[in-house]
């Protein structure tokens, strides 16, 4: 019995000891928490000059959410090698694994990058470059025998070659070229007119023979005419010109950055009023063969189309114009049928372009166009010539003032254009229309205009510097002038608010 009891005691002690050890071990054991897999992210993305021969500078990207975006001047070669920093084990475009600083990718379109962690977690990024056309189309003009262009009347034979720089179709053909413009022809940087031997579509514009090269010598930004045309397009003014910035080499000499645009003329692809329609220019230069002074306001009316051959052909055109004008001068105005003769919405939109740009040429008037079909209303447009606008003063500086009144109502006697255009402001319905169109423009288009100025400025920055090297107008780096123009437009917007509220 003793032996059995002693064995039982020994067994009990063994069990107790084991229990104590297990309890002690359990109390000291730490809880094991499974590790959370690390999400793969793209930390940095860039295109480095050192890995891309021909690149002028590194291209930096902004990473926001799943978007990776950069803004960069347009380049013909868009197959570029990016560099990146990521915590992922692998990064892929499609099924192709990417190596930082080594794998070339076509950035002419959005590329989808997938980063994958060692645990198989994935994240997708959409990488794109917003390309801005900094490499402008280049026009190479070679006159016959290198003949200089010295006349606004006599054309010189020439060849024209256009390098579209990958953005536009290239072109080679024959043309004639002469000078153009009124006061602008007297400046060192000359404007020109081209007449192709055969109609052609140039720089994406509808096929025609006649084209214009605007020099913009007075313009420190080289974009004021383009900005005005943008406003006209936003307001849907009929037949507003397109503007394409270009570089020009004439007879093997680079002559600067120009605006390439359409010649204002009657044609199906220009001012489409038909063969029996009319195009008028109101201009105090008064230098066309067929012209007249209107009876009511002494407007200098010149006939641009149709092409007349005898003085008697002018009489019915003059009579019809005077009849329209008489309705404006009528003491019963505006309670008469004047709206049946003139498109008042076109007048209102036309005024707003000139108000916002502070183009006071309406007062003379100068370079002021009207058109009509044979049976239609007199309609304002196309808009033209904004060299002397945007706060321009006679010392040839822009942006000095933003609060100049649109009309010269304080002059004695009143200029012809002032009398004609301010007459519309005596019509309450017209003023209400003008105010509504302005409100609509401010809310729907003004911000886009400011962005257009920024984008256009970027697109010409290299050409602007090259132009400055020749003509020393404005500044070599036009970013300051771009910002000045944006600020001026914003201030001018506030002034137009006050002006219209005073009507």
Question: Model regions: which residues?
Answer:
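Beta-rich interaction/scaffold domains
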Residues: 27-137, 141
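Regulatory N- and C-terminal appendages and interdomain linkers associated
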Residues: 28-36, 43-44, 48, 116-118, ...
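Conserved oxyanion/phosphate-binding beta-strand-loop segments in alpha/beta enzyme cores
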Residues: 156-215
